[in-house]
A protein has these predicted regions:
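Bacterial N-terminal signal peptides that target proteins for export
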Residues: 1-8
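Cleavable N-terminal signal peptides
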Residues: 9-10, 20
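N-terminal signal peptide c-region/cleavage motif recognized by signal peptidases
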Residues: 15-17
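N-terminal secretory-pathway/extracellular module detecting exported/lumenal segments
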Residues: 19-74, 80-133
Length: 133
């Protein structure tokens, strides 16, 4: 029931922004102060890897590295579903209106392909994305 309520809140928050979203979101999990959903429209496979993005909606304002406040995030990942590894390839943090207040694209050295810890948020994200490919 808690997950359904959080997913409903996620939907309301997205609708409340007044921005049209073309994504088809699939709930991943609700943890601490945020809801996580896979953008299934973002799934792209190439050379044995799967690229995808995850939308996050926070229940309270967060602070970006540059000091800006944000309530939403879009993180992009590259996963090797067979090897069970993934890497973070991009971060975009948005305020309540959907305006990007901070973005970051790590290098391969900064964010290498790694196997997420069992039952971690990253493991849940990869399991959801790889399960839909």
């Amino acid at each position: 029931m808690k997950k359904m309520t959080s997913i409903a809140i996620l939907g309301l928050l997205i609708a409340a922004t007044g921005v049209a979203y073309a994504e088809t979101l699939r709930a991943i999990t609700v943890e601490q102060n945020a809801s996580y959903a896979l953008d299934t429209d973002s799934l792209v496979q190439s050379n044995g890897k799967t690229a995808f993005s995850v939308q996050t909606v926070f229940t309270s304002k967060m602070k970006a590295p540059n000091g800006a406040e944000y309530t939403k995030a879009t993180n992009t990942f590259l996963a090797d579903c067979k090897a069970k590894t993934q890497a973070l390839t991009g971060v975009s943090l948005m305020d309540g209106s959907g305006k990007v207040v901070y973005s970051y694209n790590p290098t391969v050295t900064e964010a290498p392909m790694i196997a997420p810890e069992r039952n971690s948020l990253d493991a849940k994200i990869m399991q959801t994305a790889c399960g839909l490919k």
